[in-house]
Every structure is written in structure tokens, then in C-alpha cells.
């Protein structure tokens, strides 16, 4: 037995008020937390509130994300981070700048990443990050980025990565799906597939078995014999996991691009996501 994990949704009213609805989620409630979403007139998310803090998003007239005010992102300090983004005429990001969190005018930059696209024939190919050149093979696979060197096979199948003190190798099955990863720092990880779904993972003394829901998203992970359920946000990021009693055991935070920025909770170090 155990506690059922329930996610409840409400939606924005449609053109006829409470007699109609839209596909836009207004609130999403799970594991005791309610997230409230706001949108602009084109359906872009402009705010996500958990009842304590709100992450806000700003877009330009082309719908490009140009600013994020995130009180949970600690890049610029424990009080949060405001990110400002600049793009070229082709929509490629050119600059990503972090400031101390504010919803008003920003102060001095804390961090700035710059992106260059200098290939005359491939206008949106990233050729340098923060002044460090990125090289590619003839079909566009990266070969080096200033830190890692990459090896490829069968077109776009990555076979290995190497940097100072670390080497990673990958193996695949006949369908081209990854079945093994071996790294200097973490040893060997084996992946057991059912069709295209990962159903079992073995990593040292860690064993994980995965079950999927009707939308083919991971719903349950059995970690070393104990079951945990996945929690998702509206953007389909895994934001946490709960145990059989419905208690939150791990929580994940992401940036606006879906990249993880922090992990907390009792299972933070277990890599069950």
C-alpha cells in the first residue's frame, strides 16, 4: 500500500468566461504544492508562483525570452538571479548575463556568457563560447569545446568523451540505443531497454527500475527496492519525487531553458531522476 500521488489542474477561462475553458493551465497542485501560472496574450508563460516566490519571464515582440527574474536561482547569490538575454537577427542567443535578483532595473553584471556564430555557410552553428572555439566534423558533430574532446560513429552516435583526468565511453545496441556508459569517475552504468524506453539501470550498487504512464513519461522509479513517484511541472520538467507516503524526498530546480540548477532533499545524491 501507500499514498496515491494526485495532480490536480485548473485552466484559464475561455472567451465565454466560466462557461468555457482554454488549454492553458492556471494552477497545478501536487504533493502539497500549488503552482500558479500566468501568460501573455500569445500564450507564453510570464509567471510561475508557488505561493511563496514567483519566477517571472519577459519576451520581446518576436516572442524571444529576454529576461528571467528567478528568486530561486543562486547564480548571482542566495537572494536570486535576474538573467537578461540578447539575440542576433537570426534568433541565435548572443549574450546571457546574470545580475542580482530584481524585478526593476538591473545593477552590475555578476556573470556574462557570450556566444559566437562565425561560420559563413552555417549561420546558426555555435563556433565559440566565451571566446573559446568549438570545432565540428563535416556533418556538424562537435569535436572539441575547449574542455572536452568528442568521438563519433554511425553519423551522430557519440562513442566517447575525454578531458583532463576523465574519460567516458558509450556502447549501443543494434537499434542504436545506448546500453552502457563507462566513466573514469563513476564506473560503468548499464541501461536495459524495452523498445525505446529505459526500464532498468544498474550503476555500481544502485539499481533502478522505471514504469511509464499513459503518456509514456516515467511515473515510478524503484530505487534499490523502494518505490518513488515522479512529480512534473507544466513544462514537463521532473521537479521532485515522493515516497510511498507522499513525502517529498528530492526536489529539482531548473533555469528557463530546462537545465537543472539545484537539487535538494534526502535523495539529492542518488541521481534517480
Where are these regions (language model features)?
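Residue-level markers of secondary-structure register and packing in elongated scaffolds
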Residues: 1-10, 36-95, 133-193, 200, ...
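Short loop/turn segments immediately following beta-strands, especially the blade-tip
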Residues: 14-18, 118
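Extracellular beta-strand-rich, repetitive "passenger/adhesive" scaffolds
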Residues: 20-24
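Extracellular, surface-exposed repeat architectures
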Residues: 110-128
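Extended, non-globular alpha-helical segments
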Residues: 206-216
Amino acid at each position: 500500500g501507500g499514498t496515491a500521488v494526485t495532480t490536480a489542474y485548473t485552466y484559464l477561462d475561455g472567451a465565454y468566461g466560466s462557461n468555457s475553458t482554454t488549454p492553458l493551465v492556471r494552477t497545478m497542485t501536487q504533493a502539497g504544492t500549488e503552482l500558479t501560472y500566468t501568460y501573455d496574450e500569445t500564450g507564453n508563460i510570464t509567471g510561475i508562483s508557488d505561493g511563496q516566490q514567483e519566477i517571472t519571464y519577459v519576451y520581446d515582440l518576436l516572442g524571444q525570452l529576454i529576461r528571467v527574474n528567478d528568486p530561486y536561482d543562486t547564480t548571482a547569490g542566495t537572494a536570486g538571479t535576474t538573467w537578461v538575454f540578447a539575440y542576433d537577427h537570426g534568433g541565435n542567443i548572443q549574450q546571457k548575463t546574470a545580475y542580482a535578483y530584481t524585478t526593476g532595473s538591473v545593477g552590475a553584471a555578476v556573470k556574462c556568457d557570450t556566444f559566437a556564430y562565425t561560420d559563413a555557410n552555417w549561420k546558426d552553428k555555435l563556433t565559440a563560447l566565451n571566446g573559446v572555439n568549438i570545432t565540428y566534423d563535416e556533418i556538424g558533430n562537435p569535436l572539441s569545446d575547449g574542455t572536452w574532446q568528442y568521438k563519433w560513429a554511425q553519423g551522430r552516435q557519440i562513442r566517447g568523451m575525454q578531458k583532463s583526468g576523465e574519460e567516458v565511453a558509450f556502447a549501443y545496441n543494434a537499434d542504436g540505443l545506448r546500453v552502457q556508459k563507462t566513466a573514469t569517475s563513476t564506473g560503468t552504468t548499464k541501461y536495459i531497454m524495452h523498445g525505446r524506453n529505459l526500464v532498468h539501470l544498474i550503476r555500481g550498487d544502485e539499481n533502478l527500475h522505471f514504469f511509464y504512464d499513459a503518456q509514456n513519461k516515467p511515473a515510478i522509479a524503484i530505487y534499490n527496492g523502494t518505490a518513488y513517484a515522479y512529480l512534473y511541472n507544466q513544462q514537463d520538467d521532473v521537479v521532485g519525487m515522493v515516497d510511498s507516503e507522499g513525502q517529498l524526498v528530492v526536489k529539482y530546480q531548473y533555469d528557463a531553458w530546462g537545465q537543472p540548477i539545484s537539487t535538494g532533499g534526502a535523495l539529492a545524491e542518488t541521481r534517480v531522476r
